[in-house]
UniProtKB/Swiss-Prot annotation:
GO CC terms, sorted: cytosol
Localization per Swiss-Prot or TrEMBL: Cytoplasm
Native source species: Shewanella loihica (strain ATCC BAA-1088 / PV-4)
NCBIfam families, alphabetized: cmk (TIGR00017)
Protein's name according to its UniProt entry: Cytidylate kinase
Binding-site residues, ATP: 12-20
InterPro entries in alphabetical order: Cytidylate_kin, Cytidylate_kinase_dom, P-loop_NTPase
Length: 230
């Protein structure tokens, strides 16, 4: 697979800090940003809207092939996600959508249908690709790969805080159970399991600040892409 622009992949489980770090790096470098998890959330939401069963692989793959989705970068304000002309940035962050996204992502035909869309985001001047298999499947030849992780307890707490801030009514114990269940499902699925790429820098974000993680990431990027001016 040829690459038209430099790519930095950032993989890891939910709540490890991928989204925050990816947005900071994209802003710092002036690069495009791909939130791969959002694509699966959008597909899950589209399935719900169109009454497609989450265990119907064929129908989900067909829906994915014709998915009308746009990602609009808003400087300093994250990413605006648009599905069929509607801003769904808030809707796709619900816990229901999060769990549904993990389920639809387990189907090989669904992943294949969305693979081309993800790779199309690789454009100049560069791309920060945030996901779960960016470095292992989608952009395996990228020289700069990161894998962020954190304890299940800390990731559940981060998710709890995030959902509370957005006005969702959530239970921390239930969230922790869902984090553990999702980890088990994602790490043991037969297609594109959640594992670090062999050449990825693994960063455990438990108990460390955002600035420190960003500096570790930038140092790795500079090492792997020495021609970049950071």
């Amino acid at each position: 697979m040829s690459q038209r622009a430099p790519i930095v992949t950032i993989d890891g489980p939910s709540g490890a800090g991928k989204g925050t770090i990816s947005q900071i790096l994209a802003s710092r470098l002036g690069w495009k940003l791909l939130d791969s998890g959002a694509i699966y959330r959008v597909l899950a939401l589209a399935a719900i809207h169109h009454n497609v069963e989450l265990d119907n692989e064929a129908s989900l793959a067909l829906l994915a092939a014709h998915l009308d989705v746009q990602f609009i970068t808003a400087n300093g304000n994250g990413i605006k996600v648009v599905l069929e002309g509607e801003d769904v940035s808030h809707a796709i962050r619900s816990q229901e959508c999060s769990n549904a996204a993990s389920k639809v992502a387990a189907f090989p035909r669904v992943r294949e249908a969305l693979l081309r869309r993800q790779r199309a985001f690789a454009e100049a001047p560069g791309l920060i690709a945030d996901g779960r298999d960016m470095g292992t499947v989608v952009f395996p030849t990228s020289p700069a790969k990161l894998y962020l992780t954190a304890s299940a307890e800390e990731r559940a707490q981060r998710r709890y805080n995030q959902l509370q801030d957005k006005g969702f009514d959530v239970n921390i114990d239930r969230l922790l159970a869902e984090v553990v269940e999702r980890d088990e499902r994602d790490m043991n699925r037969p297609v594109a399991p959640l594992v670090p790429a062999e050449d990825a820098l693994v960063i455990d974000t438990t108990g460390i600040g955002i600035d420190e993680v960003v500096e570790l990431a930038l140092s790795h990027i500079k090492e792997k892409l020495p021609d970049l001016v950071l």
